[in-house]
Regions:
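Outer-membrane beta-barrel "beta-signal"
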Residues: 383, 389-390, 395, 419-435
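Hydrophobic, lipid-facing positions within transmembrane beta-strands of outer-membrane proteins
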Residues: 73-79, 114-118, 177-183, 227-233, ...
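Outer-membrane beta-barrel translocator domains and adjoining extracellular loop/strand segments
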Residues: 58-66, 102-111, 142-151, 207-219, ...
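Transmembrane beta-barrel outer-membrane domains
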Residues: 38-42, 66-74, 107-113, 172-178, ...
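Transmembrane beta-barrel strands of outer-membrane/channel proteins
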Residues: 49-55, 92-100, 132-138, 147, ...
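Residue-level signature of outer-membrane beta-barrel architecture
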Residues: 79-85, 120-122, 183-189, 235-237, ...
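Surface-exposed strand-loop-strand hairpins of Gram-negative outer-membrane beta-barrel proteins
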Residues: 52-74
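Repeated loop/turn-to-beta-strand initiation elements of outer-membrane beta-barrel proteins
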Residues: 87-90, 126-130, 191-198, 206, ...
């Protein structure tokens, strides 16, 4: 009799725990920003700050004996303001990213990035909508990536035509400024069966050219600055309440200081967005690209497909595959990039969220024989201690390997051998607080 009662108590406890867990999972388990209302203008302000400590085992993205590791401190403040008046609303958003390396060898690679975004929406009438957006970012490219991919440190000055940081007087990360403005006009009532969208944008990328750089590297950086002008028109067809089709015609124009690198693209795309079932969603875009460069032309088919499956409220799986033709490098070669990835997001105990993702990227060069492969693995755990206090642990692993590890870079008419490929592990622990 006692054993029977004990089993009943155990079953009751298990049932209570399951019910509590189910209730907790369905509760709001996401970080909540603090919102403050200005009593005079009615503006809404919110801000937060994240501070953390981490470790990077390959700060300069190097191979073998050139690897340097360091622990670091991070600080990421955010600030936003939102306002609305009649049929107009606007938002202004700031994001900062500060990282300080403690290893004296790479302390000069500490950085502070800043990003400012603005948006203005104006409902001109039932069928006329205008959206203006702009962004400005002052950021960096870590050594061993971007324009210095495959560069390395070597004190042997007798070696010629090799891409070393020493030879070009590069002592820390490469500064970069990105600016973009966009104007989008939409014709058609919200929720209508059809809409026409006209979108015009311009983007600038400019590298910081320091006087300390060697003259050839200065010219190299200057020729990497680019202005991109985009124009697109989209016909949006809401086929059913669960399915939408987009038909897009787009023109892109890329301008460099060296006019021989100028090129343009004409793109026709078809997109489908469908809530397939109550637990799954499909987004797919297939496009035909015609690229015209000064010395050659090519055409290809790009795609971007993602499938989201949410079997239960607290667990989501996303599958993604894509292919795109990247902007050509300074040799006139162009790259076809293929990506495949999977992401799993899971919430448990009502206030803990895990995010696990893997992505494989394959970049194939069309003129010279070279294929680059990237494997990226990321894991993060978010513990919501309070609605406005969150602890985060994150880990990132990157493996970059290529079948042509000495493929040269061309700088000011000369070729310089590189050491391509690296392996990197990063992990950190941070706390985020709403202010």
């Amino acid at each position: 009799m006692y054993l029977f009662k004990a089993k009943k108590v155990q079953l009751l406890l298990v049932g209570c725990i399951c019910a509590a867990s189910s209730f907790a999972v369905n509760a709001d388990s996401t970080f909540q920003d603090s919102k403050h209302i200005d009593p005079f203008l009615g503006l809404e302000f919110s801000s937060s700050v994240s501070s953390g400590y981490g470790f990077d085992d390959n700060v300069l993205h190097q191979r073998n004996s050139h690897i340097i590791s360091s622990d670091y401190y991070t600080l990421k403040p955010t600030f936003s303001v939102f306002g609305q008046r009649n049929t107009k609303n606007f938002g202004l958003y700031y994001l900062g990213n500060y990282r300080h390396y403690n290893n004296n060898v790479v302390k000069s690679d500490s950085y502070d990035d800043h990003q400012l975004n603005g948006v203005f929406n104006w409902e001109l009438g039932i069928r006329h909508h205008l959206e203006l957006t702009g962004s400005y970012s002052k950021n960096h490219e870590a050594l061993g990536t971007g324009v210095t991919q495959g560069f390395f440190f070597d004190s042997d000055t007798s070696l010629k035509n090799i891409a070393t940081f020493n030879a070009f007087n590069i002592s820390h990360d490469i500064g970069r400024t990105d600016k973009k403005v966009d104007a989008k006009y939409t014709y058609g009532a919200k929720g209508a069966k059809g809409n026409i969208i006209v979108d015009l944008s311009q983007a600038h990328t400019n590298y910081d050219i320091l006087n300390s750089y060697q003259s050839a590297f200065k010219n190299y950086l200057e020729n990497e600055n680019v202005t991109e002008n985009d124009a697109r028109i989209v016909f949006r067809h809401q086929y059913t309440d669960r399915t939408r089709f987009d038909y897009t015609l787009m023109y892109k124009d890329f301008n460099y200081i060296n006019s021989e690198r100028d090129n343009n693209e004409l793109i026709g795309a078809f997109s489908v967005f469908s809530q397939v079932t109550g637990k799954s969603k499909l987004e797919a875009t297939v496009s035909k690209v015609q690229k015209k460069m000064q010395s050659t032309h090519f055409s290809g088919v790009n795609w971007d497909v993602s499938y989201k499956w949410q079997p239960v409220d607290y667990s989501t799986i996303i599958l993604k595959t894509s292919s795109e033709a990247k902007e050509s490098d300074n040799t006139g070669d162009f790259v076809q990039s293929f990506q495949n990835g999977i992401t799993w997001k899971h919430q448990f105990l009502g206030h803990i969220t895990s995010l696990l993702s893997y992505k494989h990227t394959s970049n194939k060069y069309h003129i010279r024989k070279r294929t680059d492969r990237y494997d990226d693995l990321a894991l993060s755990l978010h513990y919501l201690f309070r609605p406005k206090i969150e602890f985060v642990f994150d880990y990132q692993y990157t493996l970059f390997h290529t079948d042509n590890s000495t493929d040269p870079v061309f700088i000011d008419g000369n070729s310089y051998g590189r050491q391509l490929g690296y392996e990197q592990n990063q992990f950190g622990l941070s706390v985020k607080v709403a202010i």
